[in-house]
Amino acid sequence: MGNFLQSIIDRDPAAKSKLSLILTYPGVKAVFFHRIANFFSVAKFDLIARIISQFSRFLTGIEIHPGAKIGKNLFIDHGMGVVIGETSDIGDNVTIYHMATLGGIAPSINSNDQRNIKRHPTIGDEIVIEIGRASCRERV
């Protein structure tokens, strides 16, 4: 947990301390709950995994499917509205900003056609995902 928190401090100039990350960053909470939910998902306790992930969604506004594979040091900054789908595979040291959806890439009317196939993106290491970014300079 210490390396994870330090990796966020290294990437976010607004992060002041590890304690502030734990108490005030929803992305930290979402990743923590995902690790627990994923443990239960891998162990085939799917209902428990989904309950944990839905509690996390309620608490943080970030939805991570328990089956998603997430590498080390995922940083979800300003996480409201982030969705990470079931077959997503995320590498190490990835940063995701608000409103990003790693959703299904093959929509279908018949969900049976999509069971047990890869339908969400794979994200490599050291990637930053920003959706709809608008940067303003000092004067607009």
Where are these regions (language model features)?
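Terminal amphipathic alpha-helical/low-complexity segments used for targeting or macromolecular assembly
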Residues: 1-60
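Flexible, glycine/small-residue-enriched loop-and-beta-strand segment within the central core
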Residues: 42-139
